[in-house]
Curated annotation (Swiss-Prot):
Species of origin: Staphylococcus aureus (strain MSSA476)
Gene Ontology process terms (BP): carotenoid biosynthetic process
Source taxon at top rank: Bacteria
Official protein name in the record: 4,4'-diapophytoene desaturase (4,4'-diaponeurosporene-forming)
Keywords: Carotenoid biosynthesis, FAD, Flavoprotein, Oxidoreductase, Virulence
Stored InterPro entries: Amino_oxidase, Carotenoid/retinoid_OxRdtase, FAD/NAD-bd_sf
Keyword Heme: no
Sites where the protein binds FAD: 5-17
Length: 502
């Protein structure tokens, strides 16, 4: 069969490879001039920067894409586990290194607060049990009809997850120390949600980091995009770049998706899998006479969106890779207040920031004697933060100064401004324009309880035959391992339909 995949982000690349490995003819259409989507790369002034995700968790999910296609993952990506997850800075003189080794982890916890290990390990045990339930009964399956969700098994297993509790509540149940609470709460920002709003299930992120470890891909995270692109090439997939989809064509008589309009041409296909940002697809790519019924264009703005981010890609003329960790977090003096600012639409003058120094793990990513630095500051998305004008150069300059002051928390960056030889910024406006991310959301639809599982946009269209959806705003959600899972379960449903002649 001829299959179209819309979008060459990590979801689209993984999905296309899985389909092609089953013997089908696959074409990927990508609006930009490179693959990767939000897993993007910037090469500038001799530096190589990942532009989006940077932390490799759940490496088995990465490997599975290749092995499921009959290939050896080691022929495409080079993975290695990190001994330390990150350095966390509470203040200039207050740094904690978070290890993956259990004995070192216990030593770290006891140095923060004697006796805290028991509560911490109880938290990890509880969250691991919830993760296993969620993975088996909710995350790794689709919901094609109401009875797939509304049944006794889902009711019983869902009750065990205690999804009405928020991430903060679960953490505070086991942990009294405020520093340790912060160590477990900030990761909900990896998927763009407030820990006070995110279901307690999203506490799985620190559990996954500490129990399964954090890895690095040679070449940076973009190495995964390149590996997937090569996998597709080896499987005979055709990738068309600079190919922006104008419309998904619906046959009104048979209510099926049978073509796409791309760069003015109508291209016919047997099935279409769309991995582009779902809200933008529902708003702009469906014909007026054939909207997605649950998500018509006029309702898209009313959905809840994850936060956005202000990113800086900085090159400096000194090599500091032996004085800083690969992954670093610098907390705001008022962590909770900063979270409120992000989700209430206000800019912070004392933000928590994430700092990634890739040459610590791969010297090829910066010129000899120099260092590239990636900084992420969570911000409101463009709906909640409608009063923020990201095109205002005075404003972005002010934010850069805030970030440079915050970076000075790390001793080696105290005089960073005098060493800058390259600087690039990426704002919420850029998320919207580059990736068609609705409201510049960095992680798609916010995974609130009302926008999760059965209540999230589904992988198999309920309105039109031969139309499928995958990606961060669809089930099961955002984050690289999760969108890779989205690709897998969606393709499984498509192949099942093909085999059954549906």
């Amino acid at each position: 069969m001829k299959i179209a995949v819309i979008g060459a982000g990590v979801t689209g690349l993984a999905a296309a490879a899985r389909i092609a490995s089953q013997g089908h003819e696959v074409t990927i259409f990508e609006k930009n001039n490179n693959v990767g989507g939000r897993m993007n790369q910037l090469k500038k002034d001799g530096f190589t920067f990942d532009m989006g995700p940077t932390i490799v968790m759940m490496p088995d999910v990465y490997k599975d894409v290749f092995t499921a296609c009959g290939k050896n993952y080691e022929d495409y990506i080079e993975l290695r586990q990190l001994r330390y997850i990150y350095d966390v800075y509470f203040d200039h003189d207050d740094r904690i290194t978070v290890p993956t080794d259990l004995a070192e982890l216990q030593q770290m916890l006891e140095s923060i607060e004697p006796g805290s290990t028991h509560g911490f390990m109880s938290f990890l045990t509880d969250v691991y049990k919830k993760y296993e339930i969620a993975r088996r009964y909710f995350l790794e399956r689709t919901y094609r009809k109401p009875s797939d969700f509304y049944n006794m098994t889902s009711l019983v297993q869902g009750a065990k997850l205690k999804t009405l509790n928020h991430a903060d509540q679960l953490i505070e149940h086991y942990i009294d120390n405020e520093k340790i609470q912060k160590l477990l709460a900030f990761q909900t920002l990896y998927i763009g949600i407030d820990p006070k709003r995110g279901p307690s299930l999203y506490s799985i992120i620190p559990m996954i980091e500490m129990m399964f470890g954090v890895h690095f891909i040679k070449g940076g995270m973009y190495g995964m995009a390149q590996g997937l692109a090569q996998l597709n090439k080896d499987l005979g997939v055709n990738i068309e770049l600079n190919a922006e989809i104008e419309q998904i064509i619906i046959d009104p008589k048979f209510k099926r998706a049978d073509a796409i309009k791309v760069n003015g041409d109508i291209r016919k296909f047997d099935k279409i899998l769309c991995t582009a940002d779902f809200p933008s697809v529902a708003e702009s790519l469906m014909p007026d006479f054939a909207p997605i019924k649950k998500y018509p264009p006029h309702k898209i703005a009313d959905l809840d969106y994850s936060c956005s981010a202000f990113l800086m890609y900085i090159g400096i003329d000194i090599d500091v890779t032996d004085q800083v960790r690969l992954h670093n977090v610098i907390f705001s003096d008022d962590f909770r207040g900063n979270i409120e600012e992000i989700f209430e639409g206000r800019l912070s003058y004392d933000p928590s920031i994430y700092v990634y120094v890739p040459a610590v793990a791969d010297k090829s990513l910066a010129p000899e004697g120099k260092t590239g630095i990636y900084v992420l500051m969570p911000t409101p998305e463009l709906k909640t933060g409608s009063g923020i004008d990201w095109s205002d150069e005075a404003l972005t300059q002010q934010i850069k100064e805030i970030i440079y002051r915050k970076l000075a928390t790390i001793e080696v960056f105290e005089d960073i401004k005098s060493h800058i030889v390259s600087e690039t910024i990426f704002t919420p406006n850029d998320f919207e324009q580059t990736y068609h991310a609705k409201f510049g959301s960095a992680f798609g639809l916010m995974p609130t309880l009302a926008q999760s599982n059965y209540y999230r946009p589904q992988n198999v269209s309920r309105d039109y035959k031969d139309l499928y959806f995958a990606g961060a705003s669809t089930h099961p959600g955002a984050g690289v391992p999760i969108v890779l899972t989205s690709a897998k379960i969606t393709v499984d449903e498509m192949i099942k339909d093909i085999e059954q002649g549906v």
